[in-house]
């Protein structure tokens, strides 16, 4: 294989081409590749940060959800206690009202009994006076009669 002038010319042209590429083509390509690597690295870092933020947010949501559940359970328990208290108060009031009604009924019955006794005493007294008049066949003094009847009624 002979080295001739064409081969030397091609070698010089290739050297100029390599120098031209290293001077004008290679730096923008390296800069573009470096910029792309930086953007990819920034994107990966942002993704990692977002993943960490998501994990923190999920933990916070779980914590707040647990707190809300606990608060809801506490409110339900408090409502149940209040309902039981209201039921007990209603029972107490109903018992007191029943006792009051029973007492009023007892007083009304006692009053009716006393009224009936008084009426019966008056009827017995009137019958006694009528019987005494028939036996004695004379009119008894009304004031003396009333006094005797009052004493008799007091004894009954």
Swiss-Prot record:
Q: Is Cell inner membrane set as a keyword in this record?
A: yes
Q: Which Gene3D superfamilies match?
A: 6.10.250.1580
**One CC-aspect GO term:** proton-transporting ATP synthase complex
Where is this gene product found?
Cell inner membrane
Q: Name one Pfam family in it.
A: ATP-synt_B
InterPro entries (alphabetical): ATP_synth_B-like_membr_sf, ATP_synth_b/b'su_bac/chlpt, ATP_synth_F0_bsu_bac, ATP_synthase_B_chain
> Which residues are listed as membrane-spanning?
5-25
User: In its keyword annotation, does this UniProt entry include Acyltransferase?
Assistant: no
Write down the membrane topology.
Single-pass membrane protein
Keywords (A to Z) from UniProt: ATP synthesis, Cell inner membrane, Cell membrane, CF(0), Hydrogen ion transport, Ion transport, Membrane, Transmembrane, Transmembrane helix, Transport
Similarity annotation: Belongs to the ATPase B chain family.
Q: What does this protein do?
A: F(1)F(0) ATP synthase produces ATP from ADP in the presence of a proton or sodium gradient. F-type ATPases consist of two structural domains, F(1) containing the extramembraneous catalytic core and F(0) containing the membrane proton channel, linked together by a central stalk and a peripheral stalk. During catalysis, ATP synthesis in the catalytic domain of F(1) is coupled via a rotary mechanism of the central stalk subunits to proton translocation. Component of the F(0) channel, it forms part of the peripheral stalk, linking F(1) to F(0).
- What NCBIfam families is this protein classified in? ATP_synt_b (TIGR01144), PRK05759.1-2 (NF004411)
Question: Quaternary arrangement and interactors, per the entry?
Answer: F-type ATPases have 2 components, F(1) - the catalytic core - and F(0) - the membrane proton channel. F(1) has five subunits: alpha(3), beta(3), gamma(1), delta(1), epsilon(1). F(0) has three main subunits: a(1), b(2) and c(10-14). The alpha and beta chains form an alternating ring which encloses part of the gamma chain. F(1) is attached to F(0) by a central stalk formed by the gamma and epsilon chains, while a peripheral stalk is formed by the delta and b chains.
Task: Report the HAMAP family cross-referenced here.
Answer: ATP_synth_b_bprime
Its protein name is ATP synthase subunit b
Organism per entry = Acinetobacter baumannii (strain ATCC 17978 / DSM 105126 / CIP 53.77 / LMG 1025 / NCDC KC755 / 5377)
Question: Which gene is the coding source of this polypeptide chain?
Answer: atpF
């Amino acid at each position: 294989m002979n080295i001739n002038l064409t081969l030397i010319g091609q070698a010089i042209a290739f050297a100029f081409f390599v120098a031209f590429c290293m001077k004008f083509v290679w730096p923008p390509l390296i800069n573009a590749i470096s910029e792309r690597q930086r953007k990819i690295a920034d994107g990966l870092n942002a993704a990692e940060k977002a993943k960490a933020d998501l994990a923190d947010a999920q933990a916070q949501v779980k914590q707040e959800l647990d707190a809300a559940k606990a608060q809801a359970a506490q409110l339900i328990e408090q409502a149940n206690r209040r309902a039981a208290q209201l039921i007990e108060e209603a029972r107490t009031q109903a018992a007191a009202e029943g006792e009051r009604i029973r007492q009023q009924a007892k007083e009304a019955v006692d009053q009716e009994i006393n009224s009936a006794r008084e009426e019966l005493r008056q009827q017995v007294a009137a019958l006694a006076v009528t019987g005494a008049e028939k036996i004695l066949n004379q009119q008894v003094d009304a004031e003396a009669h009333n006094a005797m009847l009052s004493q008799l009624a007091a004894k009954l």
